[in-house]
Amino acid sequence: MPKTQRGIYHNLKESEYVASNTDVTFFFSSELYLNKFLDGYQEYRKKFNKKIERVAVTPWNMDMLADITFYSEVEKRGFHAWLKGDNATWREVHVYALRIMTKPNTLDWSRIQKPRLRERRKSMV
């Protein structure tokens, strides 16, 4: 299904609105949602970490988990993500976020062009 006149994709797999932090790639149904995510993820990370710290003080880096939660809140038309160039389910992305909690830094997000199939296969090798 192509994008509508207002630039909305109902099938996230076809969307050209893409954000990536090199490991994880999120697809958005509209440019509005993409911009909302890119403009707000750093602030959401701070809020998310404050919520966690109220319950327990933890040495782990919760940024990726916060980013996944924020993506789920912003994108209202589904969930579509790639993990290192391959399709990933909601659960697989969460497991990845739990694995990288021990890393001190989380990469920042940026808008990218939707990778073509050939480029995607190169990144998987």
From Swiss-Prot:
Keywords (A to Z) from UniProt: Activator, DNA-binding, Early protein, Repressor, Sigma factor, Transcription, Transcription regulation
Site label Interaction with host RNA polymerase and activation of the phi29 late A3 promoter, positions: R120
Claim: Repressor is one of the keywords in the record: yes
Residue ranges for the DNA-binding region feature of this UniProt entry: 77-96
Effect of L117A: 60% loss of transcription activation from the A3 promoter and 60% loss of transcription repression from the A2c promoter. Poor interaction with host RNAP
Effect of R120Q: 80% loss of transcription activation from the A3 promoter and 80% loss of transcription repression from the A2c promoter. Complete loss of interaction with host RNAP
Domain of life: Viruses
InterPro entries, sorted: Phi-29-like_sf, Phi-29_GP4
GO biological process: regulation of DNA-templated transcription
Similarity annotation: Belongs to the phi29likevirus late genes activator p4 family.
Task of the protein: Mediates, together with protein p6, the early to late transcriptional switch by stabilizing the binding of host RNA polymerase (RNAP) to the late A3 promoter. Activates transcription from the late A3 promoter and represses the main early promoters A2b and A2c by modifying the topology of the sequences encompassing early promoters A2c and A2b and late promoter A3 in a hairpin. Proteins p6 and p4 bind cooperatively to an approximately 200 bp DNA region located between the late A3 and the early A2c promoters.
Record's protein name: Late genes activator p4
Species of provenance: Bacillus phage phi29 (Bacteriophage phi-29)
UniProt gene name: 4
